[in-house]
Regions:
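Substrate-binding cleft and catalytic face of glycoside hydrolase catalytic domains
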Residues: 1-12, 38-45
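Alpha-helix N-cap and loop-to-helix initiation/capping positions
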Residues: 7-18, 53-58
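Acidic/aromatic-lined carbohydrate-recognition and catalytic surfaces
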Residues: 14, 18, 29, 34-36
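Short amphipathic alpha-helices and their capping/turn segments at secondary-structure boundaries
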Residues: 22-29, 235
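Catalytic-core regions of glycoside hydrolase
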Residues: 33-195
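Catalytic cores of secreted or luminal carbohydrate-active enzymes
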Residues: 170-231
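Extracellular/luminal regions of secreted and cell-surface proteins that mediate adhesion/ECM remodeling
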Residues: 218-334
Length: 334
């Protein structure tokens, strides 16, 4: 009965709500280990499709039940933008008052509508809570996923020879769509048909990506990918050094967890550490950020390091030889 939501679901909707309460209690205890809770249990594979419990009223009741335990501390994702808009009024969307709710897409590339993620009507005709056209929904997802981790499953096309089903054969188009969706994660084991295709397909990029497969490129760009692009060092006055750093998030998405950027000066006798930024989690995919600081001159090596705020875990730069911290230079005289 796996995948047959209408057959496998309980006859009582109250039982669904009971299970959501039970799961909510577990999530509340493990909130520090959960990035996103996908779906509301209903439908085939729990993916919020092929279900008797996906009316607007059912969706609202399930969301209300989960919110009791998840509040704003645990992210919850629904399957389609239309379901998301059922729960978030347009006024709240405009004010960006929706931190705890996002999207997952388990039909990426499966069809031109991502297997029902998008509709065919224009927004003006459909209204706020109904599915919109592919172009409009992708633009909507782009806004949601800047501040909420969006992921799911890439699916092989049912009819790859159709003219409108050629997307996954074009590496540039695949990468462009993932960038627009700000994809943070993908299922590693499904759909292997498309994943194996990517492993044999060139990513079509130059530079360090020349000769790499599309699978390698996508794997390296899901979520965040911080690259130090430029460093300037100025001497505004004696015994002082001014640094200007330019960091690009080359990944598709943001970090989505609070993190801090530090400047470390170190020699055999002493070590100094300076906090440069507490907004690393706001460095959006595809954007470049400038960080400036002035500090006392000190002989020795100079490093940059990013650490997750809640536990100090190292967030590595993608630059070569970055390891747990990135060496940006050495000062031999002051």
């Amino acid at each position: 009965r796996e995948g047959k939501g209408l057959e496998a679901e309980p006859e009582s909707f109250e039982l669904v709500l009971t299970h959501l309460i039970q799961i909510g209690e577990v999530l509340e205890k493990e909130k520090h280990s959960v990035l996103v809770f996908q779906g509301f249990l209903v439908g085939s594979w729990g993916e919020m499709h092929t279900s008797a419990y996906l009316t607007e009223e059912h969706i609202r009741q399930m969301w209300d039940m989960l919110k009791i335990h998840t509040t704003d501390k645990i992210r919850v994702a629904v399957r389609t933008p239309a379901q998301w808009r059922t729960l978030i009024p347009e006024e709240k969307f405009q004010k960006r008052e929706w931190k705890a709710l996002g999207l997952f897409d388990d039909g990426i590339f499966g069809s031109t509508t991502h297997l029902g993620t998008f509709g065919t009507m224009m927004r003006e005709a459909a209204g706020w809570e109904k599915p919109w056209s592919r172009k409009e929904e992708l633009e909507f997802i782009e806004q949601i996923s800047r501040d909420f981790p969006c992921g799911g499953e890439a699916i092989a096309e049912a009819d790859p020879d159709r003219a409108d089903q050629i997307l996954t054969k074009d590496a540039k188009a695949v990468i462009s769509e993932m960038q627009k969706m700000h994809l943070a994660y993908l299922n590693l084991v499904h759909d292997t048909r498309i994943l194996d295709q990517w492993k044999a397909q060139s990513c079509g990029k130059d530079g360090i990506w020349s000769g790499k497969t599309l699978y390698e490129y996508v794997s390296a760009h899901l979520g965040y990918r911080f690259v130090l692009k430029k460093v300037e060092m100025l001497v505004p006055k004696r015994d002082k050094i001014k640094f200007i750093f330019e960091v690009e998030n080359c990944g598709f998405a943001s970090l989505f967890q609070e993190a801090q950027l530090f400047l470390i000066q170190e020699n055999e006798k002493e070590r100094k550490e300076m906090l440069l930024s507490e907004e690393v989690q706001k460095w959006h995919g595809g954007s470049t950020y400038k960080v400036e600081t002035e500090t006392g001159a000190m002989k020795g090596n100079i490093f940059l390091q990013i650490r997750r705020k809640k536990d100090g875990k190292i967030i590595s730069f993608a630059n070569k030889n970055s390891a747990d911290r990135l060496l940006i230079g050495s000062l031999h005289s002051v």
